[in-house]
Swiss-Prot record:
Similarity remark: Belongs to the universal ribosomal protein uS17 family.
Source taxon at top rank: Bacteria
Signal peptide (from-to): none
Record GO biological process: translation
Source organism: Rickettsia canadensis (strain McKiel)
PANTHER family from the UniProt entry: 40S RIBOSOMAL PROTEIN S11 FAMILY MEMBER, SMALL RIBOSOMAL SUBUNIT PROTEIN US17M
Record InterPro entries: NA-bd_OB-fold, Ribosomal_uS17, Ribosomal_uS17_bact/chlr, Ribosomal_uS17_CS
GO MF term list: rRNA binding; structural constituent of ribosome
A GO cellular-component term linked to this record: cytosolic small ribosomal subunit
Protein keywords: Ribonucleoprotein, Ribosomal protein, RNA-binding, rRNA-binding
Subunit text: Part of the 30S ribosomal subunit.
Gene field: rpsQ
Protein task: One of the primary rRNA binding proteins, it binds specifically to the 5'-end of 16S ribosomal RNA.
Coiled coil: none
Protein name (database record): Small ribosomal subunit protein uS17
Amino acid sequence: MPKRVLQGVVISSKADKTVTVKVERKFKHPIYKKFVKVSKKYAAHDSENRYQEGDKVSIIESRPISKTKTWIVVNGK
């Protein structure tokens, strides 16, 4: 099974080797037919402390790195 890849924005980079990435998705509500925007935060591993707040990044699913980190930052702008 392929690993999931998500795109989001770094909202926190205060922790060492960890960034918090906010991922937004849009879907159409099944009853009201309105597009709803939902966001979720993921803790991702950034081994070189390269990314700062506001950077757009891609994260990929991986094995558990810690209690909350199961994603790795693969590239960004």
